[in-house]
């Protein structure tokens, strides 16, 4: 039972780290990256479809993305979806390819984005700590039901704390890398 609690806590913490990584990937840096457009959905025959299912997103150069749309009738819809996203991008179509130049980030915008990234990291840390709290309360309830000893509780809490520290350290490393990426000119 205790191993189940530890394994559950570890897998939930890993999901928290992955979620934080995903949220940070959405924050636009000065460099072109295909994952920048992952959140964009296009109206495709009446249903909202992810952009990567209606076209191929690639990097043209360090500041330009290219979207090769599979169905040429979808070019207008894809352009509209990119423009209406909150990324502040202006796509230009050239045949079946849509080019998306990324404007350079101003110093002020970089600082705002760093605040956003730090907030995402803090949300990730909070989620990891909540998992720790849940695991510790589960173990204590086992002790109250006399299904484990006080020593088992202490050992499990120590193990869960080690998981917590390791996952928070991972989130901090992701944050540091993202901040460095944002401050690159």
Swiss-Prot record:
One of its GO terms (cellular component) is cytosol. GO terms for molecular function: ribosomal large subunit binding. Transmembrane segments: none annotated. It is found in: Cytoplasm. HAMAP family: RRF. NCBIfam families: frr. Belongs to the RRF family. This is Ribosome-recycling factor. The gene is frr.
